[in-house]
Design a protein with these regions (language model features):
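RNase H-like, Mg2+-dependent phosphodiesterase core
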Residues: 1-192
Length: 192
């Protein structure tokens, strides 16, 4: 990597849940930026992630966050939706090199690397994971305010026992991903 090369890193939050959006974030820092508090978002408390969100957005040279609705995920599938969002951010990034967390970007017209467990190995991928997770968690809290009986602020849309019980009791909402097994099953049984 030459001394003038700049790198952007991309990660996502929300591939596994059965409700809520997919959020993909990209971030670019000044070369040599470091911060020991930034870590894989899954290893941090909600309070630490929130504080780091502000730090990251203030310190970044550039960042972008995309929120992709459930209907798009259902139409295209989660893998394709994730890859297309990462490609969009990668194209927009004012950089020469792009790192992604375990997602190949073969059609990208920039140098790229897919890093397995990148949010554990790269500070900038970890920063992108924090931006994505905080944005998605905030979205799920708003859904929880609209539909408190579903418990979205607790399970964040993942198919927990409590979430499946809420689906059984109250039915499928627009925010549920109809292409995901538990929701498909519910639609077939109850025809919501």
């Amino acid at each position: 990597m030459g001394s003038t090369s700049r790198c952007s890193s991309i990660d996502e939050a929300g591939r596994g849940p059965i409700a809520g959006p997919l959020v993909v974030a990209g971030v670019c820092f000044e070369k040599g930026f470091t911060n020991e508090m930034i870590d894989d978002s899954k290893k941090l408390t909600e309070k630490k992630r929130e504080a780091l969100f502000s730090l990251i957005t203030n310190e970044a040279l550039w960042y972008q966050i995309l929120v992709i609705e459930e209907k798009i995920i259902d139409k295209k599938n989660i893998y394709r939706t994730t890859q297309e969002a990462m490609l969009e951010i990668a194209h927009n990034a004012p950089v020469d090199i792009v790192l992604s967390d375990a997602m190949p970007l073969p059609s990208l017209d920039k140098e790229w690397e897919s890093v397995i467990k990148g949010d554990q190995k790269s500070l900038s991928i970890a920063a992108a994971s924090i931006l994505a997770k905080v944005t998605r968690d905030r979205y799920m809290k708003k859904l929880d305010e609209l539909y408190p009986m579903y418990g979205f602020s607790k399970h964040k849309g993942y198919p927990t026992k409590a979430h499946i019980e809420a689906l059984n009791t109250y039915g499928v909402l627009d925010c549920h991903r109809r292409s995901y097994g538990p929701v498909q099953k519910m639609l077939e049984i109850k025809l919501f």
